[in-house]
């Protein structure tokens, strides 16, 4: 918005020439981060007071960690603060004509809405389970598939008109269409190794990445500050990848696919980092507010969508290794329990408790130890992911 305003003012008078600074992507990214940070810090106390007055407190499962019972009643749905900060800051500083940022915003707010309904049911109905898994998965699938269907053609073409033409061509060809190499699965650490996916393969993979990342972040969000800092780190790293793929010169030099317009996602990633830091101010142990599903589902989906756009799905799995392991720990725990119950008549557990962070708590780690150690691991994984920029 401010970019368009600055361009309009420059056209009116040469005296506004100093506003050309807003044309620089890096400048707008810095301003987006600062804007989101300030909005979050200023709005945070008011939101916490409002949630407290409305008695929107987090119910704690009776079969959960005993040490977490004291957290019962802590205001939840604080993820709304993150989404507000991201949305306002991004709308102020990004190029409004950029379709990639719009699709990420829509996916983020869509998954945020699902999370809001889930949190609201937990609070109003006093039901720790909230929205039933089937219903939640259905709406996640609807948004994920719509985003995937748009992105498969959006990444292949440079304008919405061309996207529509490619879609029509795909339908007329009997749903058989070869996509350009940049729409393939990019393998890190190798020079220009890209496996063709086809339209169906791209849609399925994108759907799995978006929905999977959303649920993985949600499962990780179980301790004070545990999820938000890895989200900040991974999001910031993806912003660097977005800057590279959006710049023809850097993309060619580093042997990355050039995705025109993807660089503008740096503004969104910066806003996410600023909003995340503001939220961490209030979410640090002992937390004054919890993110809730409204934040966790939305942030995870946004990371997945950005990774798809910049063609770094595998790198996302590397940098977000904590999210992956947390999700796998739950799936393995549930699968093993059901298998052993069916075979031996009594369910057995692989871990003391799932997700993995609760296993370490049961093993004697303090909550802050688990959180900070997971942060350190994520930082190292992000550095490994960023090394793929050059190690090819």
UniProtKB/Swiss-Prot annotation:
Enzyme Commission (EC) number: 2.7.8.13
GO molecular function annotations of the record: metal ion binding; phospho-N-acetylmuramoyl-pentapeptide-transferase activity; UDP-N-acetylmuramoyl-L-alanyl-D-glutamyl-meso-2,6-diaminopimelyl-D-alanyl-D-alanine:undecaprenyl-phosphate transferase activity
Localization, UniProt: Cell inner membrane
Cell division found in the keyword field: yes
GO BP annotations, alphabetical order: cell division; cell wall organization; peptidoglycan biosynthetic process; regulation of cell shape
Keyword Protein transport found: no
Membrane topology: Multi-pass membrane protein
Residue ranges crossing the lipid bilayer per the database entry: 24-44, 76-96, 100-120, 137-157, 170-190, 193-213, 225-245, 262-282, 289-309, 314-334, 369-389
Keywords on record: Cell cycle, Cell division, Cell inner membrane, Cell membrane, Cell shape, Cell wall biogenesis/degradation, Magnesium, Membrane, Metal-binding, Peptidoglycan synthesis, Transferase, Transmembrane, Transmembrane helix
Requisite cofactors: Mg(2+)
Pathway: Cell wall biogenesis; peptidoglycan biosynthesis
Catalytic function, reaction form: UDP-N-acetyl-alpha-D-muramoyl-L-alanyl-gamma-D-glutamyl-meso-2,6-diaminopimeloyl-D-alanyl-D-alanine + di-trans,octa-cis-undecaprenyl phosphate = di-trans,octa-cis-undecaprenyl diphospho-N-acetyl-alpha-D-muramoyl-L-alanyl-D-glutamyl-meso-2,6-diaminopimeloyl-D-alanyl-D-alanine + UMP
An example Gene Ontology CC term for this record: plasma membrane
Pfam families: Glycos_transf_4, MraY_sig1
PROSITE patterns: MRAY_1, MRAY_2
UniProt superkingdom: Bacteria
Enzyme class: transferase
Its biological purpose: Catalyzes the initial step of the lipid cycle reactions in the biosynthesis of the cell wall peptidoglycan: transfers peptidoglycan precursor phospho-MurNAc-pentapeptide from UDP-MurNAc-pentapeptide onto the lipid carrier undecaprenyl phosphate, yielding undecaprenyl-pyrophosphoryl-MurNAc-pentapeptide, known as lipid I.
Family membership: Belongs to the glycosyltransferase 4 family. MraY subfamily.
Name of the protein described by the UniProt record: Phospho-N-acetylmuramoyl-pentapeptide-transferase
Organism whose genome encodes this protein: Delftia acidovorans (strain DSM 14801 / SPH-1)
Classification of source organism: Bacteria, Pseudomonadati, Pseudomonadota, Betaproteobacteria, Burkholderiales
Name of the encoding gene: mraY
